[in-house]
Amino acid sequence: RRQRQMCIRDSYWNPVWGEYNRVRNHYNEMTVTLEQPETGRILNIRFRLFDDGLGFRYELPLQRNMNYLTVKDELTEFNLTGNHKAFCIPGDYDTNEFAYTTAPISEIAADMERRIARKSYESKAEGGLTVQTPLMLKSEDGVYLNISQTRRG
């Protein structure tokens, strides 16, 4: 069973510090609610579309008969349209102490392996293909893309 809910928000907020003293918070939002028929478990996927970007998150609302949940895997993927220039560091669970790589997506693994080998880091990117977020990309026509994640709690 699926449900969809939509809303528009247009408000302002005041940051504690930064370049601006007032920031506009304007977006269209759609929440898709998915229900697993066998268990009745519910998952919400909330999308927010801004003038300059898109955000989404998975939400597990408080539910009967579900005291805890173990997330075994997270398989979100992005299907990019080109071999964009990437600005990134290797993905590592215990350090951010890497030099940044600037290379086309197709060459990230090779470039990172060369850099890691020269510096003799203890931790290496898993398979040479994992990158740390945020991942900043630049398309051939000059559009910047930023793939990031946040954690609440």
Give names to the regions the model predicted.
Residues V23, Q36, R41-G153:
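Catalytic and substrate-binding clefts that recognize carbohydrates or anionic sugar/phosphate headgroups
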Residues Q3-I8:
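Short, small-residue-biased leader/transition segments that mark boundaries at the very start
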Residues R24-T33:
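Short, hydrophobic/aromatic-rich segments at coil-to-beta transitions
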